[in-house]
Amino acid sequence: LTQTFYLFFFRNHSLVIERFQAYLKEYDKINISIITYYEIVSGLKHRDAQKQLTSFQEFVSYNTVLPLTTSSAIISADIYANLRNKGTPIDDIDILIAGIAIANDLIIVTNNIRDFGKIENLEIQDWSK
């Protein structure tokens, strides 16, 4: 799941919440990359949003934070090289999130289809539509 998913979720986007609840009925937990975790925590700290930070930390405690491993770093490096060679680079953070997802055989939930859609072998879902 990317940062945009959490923004939709914590802003009570009805369709995102509905799909989130359906997902949890089937899988029990959400997987969060350490990169997404960093993006959200750093953004909340920058805004001094302590209440939202506490809420997010509680949410995370019930779910799984996936680390950046050597395997996911190698996959990310392959993605980076492939996109650069095609002349279609995207942000390194998005590449790292994708590498973690591919290494763990997971789907990315995001509304950033423009960038994540450039990555081969990555399944994407947009729960906001």
Task: For the regions a language model picked out, list residue spans one by one.
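Generic structural signal for small/hydrophobic residues in well-ordered secondary structure
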Residues: 2-3, 16, 40, 76, ...
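Hydrophobic/aromatic residues within well-ordered alpha-helical segments
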Residues: 36, 48, 52, 72-75
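Histidine- and aromatic-rich ligand-binding microenvironments
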Residues: 1-2, 33, 90-91, 112
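Alpha-helix capping/helix-boundary segments
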Residues: 5, 36, 72, 97, ...
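Short, well-structured N-terminal submotif of metal-dependent ribonuclease cores
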Residues: 1-32, 42-58, 63
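Acidic, PIN/NYN-like endoribonuclease modules and their adjacent C-terminal/linker elements
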Residues: 22, 98, 102-129
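Active-site neighborhoods of divalent-metal-dependent phosphate/nucleic-acid chemistry enzymes
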Residues: 64-109
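General small-molecule cofactor/ligand-binding pocket signal
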Residues: 31, 66, 125
